[in-house]
């Protein structure tokens, strides 16, 4: 391998604003397959670390792939430091994780990374399941989130079902959901964005609730009837981009929600089952 060595000047290394750790598909627009282009549209540099590599989501008649082996996963993370590509790192985001062991490996990497990046923003989307499907990850993942990732995160973006799993509390009404979110806050975890709080069914509205120690903001947006997948991944990509571009949290959440609605409508207009990002000229 040494005879192949061409690039050893670390001063020339590409630098990332964000490391995004989540699923990747060959076909489709979920996980990093939608998050990376969305983040890049915002003018930010992102490195994608896959947790699973799949042919497509399981919602098609064929489906191939699986979780990245731990040795590879830890190597992907380690290589970013070996390439000296994290000097300007500002945020790490997590989405769908393949195994509990990946969560532990990631937490160990983040803990070490924090020593050189004390202001690093860690945003965790604790992908566990939803009300309609129940838990759709391996059964040991919720406890791994609680034990390893939540203590490191500054912000998390659970849906109502995931908030219930993480807290053990019923969250089916707004007050209960807010109380559950507040129970997770700590010196490290500064905010919880509940991405699917109950809304006004008659007015076809959904609510996103932004909870911090000193404020609660409820944001209502239109409910779009759709089977599109990856909207949560897109929302998180837009949210972290907005935060890094200087938006206040509630404003960043509001803008991210509007962008997701725009992308969904654009996708429907183009009669696609996979999210399509509008070109910048149309964004």
Swiss-Prot record:
Reaction catalyzed: pyridoxal + ATP = pyridoxal 5'-phosphate + ADP + H(+); pyridoxine + ATP = pyridoxine 5'-phosphate + ADP + H(+); pyridoxamine + ATP = pyridoxamine 5'-phosphate + ADP + H(+)
Cellular component annotations (GO), alphabetically ordered: cytosol
Residue numbers binding substrate: 23, 59, 233
UniProt record, GO biological process: pyridoxal 5'-phosphate salvage
Molecular function as annotated in GO: ATP binding; hydroxymethylpyrimidine kinase activity; magnesium ion binding; pyridoxal kinase activity; zinc ion binding
Chain sites annotated for binding ATP: 125, 157, 162, 195, 221-224, 231
Cofactor: Mg(2+)
Domain of life: Bacteria
EC number from the UniProt entry: 2.7.1.35
Pathway, per record: Cofactor metabolism; pyridoxal 5'-phosphate salvage; pyridoxal 5'-phosphate from pyridoxal: step 1/1; Cofactor metabolism; pyridoxal 5'-phosphate salvage; pyridoxine 5'-phosphate from pyridoxine: step 1/1; Cofactor metabolism; pyridoxal 5'-phosphate salvage; pyridoxamine 5'-phosphate from pyridoxamine: step 1/1
Pfam families membership: Phos_pyr_kin
Residues involved in Mg(2+) binding: 136, 162
Enzymatic class: transferase
Listed SUPFAM superfamilies: Ribokinase-like
Keyword terms, alphabetized: ATP-binding, Kinase, Magnesium, Metal-binding, Nucleotide-binding, Transferase, Zinc
HAMAP family tied to this protein: PdxK (MF_01638)
The family this protein is said to belong to: Belongs to the pyridoxine kinase family. PdxK subfamily.
Subunit composition and interactions: Homodimer.
PANTHER family per the UniProt record, alphabetical: PYRIDOXAL KINASE, PYRIDOXINE_PYRIDOXAL_PYRIDOXAMINE KINASE
Role this protein plays: B6-vitamer kinase involved in the salvage pathway of pyridoxal 5'-phosphate (PLP). Catalyzes the phosphorylation of pyridoxine (PN), pyridoxal (PL), and pyridoxamine (PM), forming their respective 5'-phosphorylated esters, i.e. PNP, PLP and PMP.
Full protein name: Pyridoxine/pyridoxal/pyridoxamine kinase
Gene name of the record: pdxK
């Amino acid at each position: 391998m040494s005879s192949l060595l061409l690039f050893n000047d670390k001063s020339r290394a590409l630098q990332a604003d964000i490391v995004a750790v989540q699923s990747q598909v060959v076909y489709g627009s979920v996980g990093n397959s939608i998050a990376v282009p969305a983040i890049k549209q915002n003018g930010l540099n992102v490195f994608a670390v896959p947790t699973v590599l799949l042919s497509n989501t399981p919602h098609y008649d064929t489906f191939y792939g699986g979780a990245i082996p731990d040795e590879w996963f830890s190597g992907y993370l380690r290589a970013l430091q070996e390439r000296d590509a994290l000097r300007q790192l500002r945020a790490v985001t997590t989405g769908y994780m393949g195994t509990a062991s990946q969560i532990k490996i990631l937490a160990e990497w983040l803990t070490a990374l924090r020593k050189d990046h004390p202001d690093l923003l860690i945003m965790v989307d604790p992908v566990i399941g939803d009300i309609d499907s129940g838990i759709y990850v391996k059964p040991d993942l919720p406890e791994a989130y609680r034990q390893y990732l939540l203590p490191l995160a500054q912000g998390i973006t659970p849906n109502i079902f995931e908030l219930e799993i993480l807290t053990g509390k019923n969250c089916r009404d707004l007050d209960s959901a807010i109380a559950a979110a507040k129970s997770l806050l700590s010196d490290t975890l500064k905010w919880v964005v509940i991405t699917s709080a109950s809304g006004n069914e008659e007015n076809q509205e959904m609510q996103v609730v932004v909870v911090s120690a000193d404020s609660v903001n409820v944001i209502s947006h239109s409910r779009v009837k759709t089977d599109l997948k990856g909207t949560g991944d897109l929302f998180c990509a837009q949210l972290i981009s907005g935060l890094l571009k200087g938006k206040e949290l509630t404003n960043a959440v509001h803008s991210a929600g509007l962008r997701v609605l725009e992308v969904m409508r654009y996708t429907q207009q183009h009669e696609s089952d996979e999210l399509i990002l509008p070109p910048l000229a149309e964004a």
